[in-house]
């Protein structure tokens, strides 16, 4: 499985998480880019390269943050890149074996942290345990005003990262405890299900 992610923090999170729920000898490689635009700019050439050598058993997963983009339009662009490269996407495949799946973290990777607050609490024991029950945090994919900023504020309020959130360090720490089966983020669940389907 080849997983393309937009930034090193996503790579760090997934390196901690994926080995705990990928079974049966399946392997994966993670390829981080320098932001969403960098990945989107390089994606057509990367997918064209894959289309020339991809073995039947390989699967590609492309993961992007939605940020403040129109998620439907972003997904359309990602799907068009797959079609233009001659790769069969999960969306287009229906019941056929697919080669590539496009997934979007809504709105940002940090929403997935809010979806698994137990993992955050294990990595950062001083954070309040009731955060998921607070108004504005109940749906991890609908946190207003910037997910990473909200996450940073909570950590800073209890003495972590006073100089600013170190995203890769936090991703690594939380990924080590993340439970793929209990995350409340719908966008995480869509990603997890695609991974499980890819390794069947």
Where are these predicted regions, by residue range?
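C-terminal accessory helical subdomains adjacent to catalytic cores in phosphodiester-
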Residues: 11-37, 41-61, 66-200
């Amino acid at each position: 499985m080849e997983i393309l992610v937009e930034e090193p923090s996503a790579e760090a999170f997934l390196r901690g998480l994926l080995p705990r729920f990928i079974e049966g000898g399946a392997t994966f490689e993670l390829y981080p880019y320098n932001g969403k635009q960098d990945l989107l700019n390089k994606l057509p050439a990367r997918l064209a390269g894959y289309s020339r050598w991809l073995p039947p058993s390989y699967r590609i997963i492309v993961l992007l943050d939605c940020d403040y983009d129109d998620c439907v339009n972003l997904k359309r662009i990602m799907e068009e890149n797959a079609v233009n490269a001659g790769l069969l996407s999960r969306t287009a495949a229906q019941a056929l074996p697919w080669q590539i799946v496009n997934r979007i973290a809504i709105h940002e990777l940090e929403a997935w942290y809010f979806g698994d607050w137990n993992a955050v609490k294990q990595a950062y024991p001083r954070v309040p345990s009731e955060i998921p029950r607070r108004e504005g945090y109940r749906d991890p994919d609908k946190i207003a005003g910037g997910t990473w900023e909200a996450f940073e504020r909570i950590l800073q309020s209890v003495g972590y990262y006073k100089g600013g959130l170190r995203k890769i360090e936090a991703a690594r720490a939380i990924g080590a405890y993340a439970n793929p089966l209990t995350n409340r983020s719908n966008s995480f669940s869509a990603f997890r299900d695609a991974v499980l389907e890819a390794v069947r």
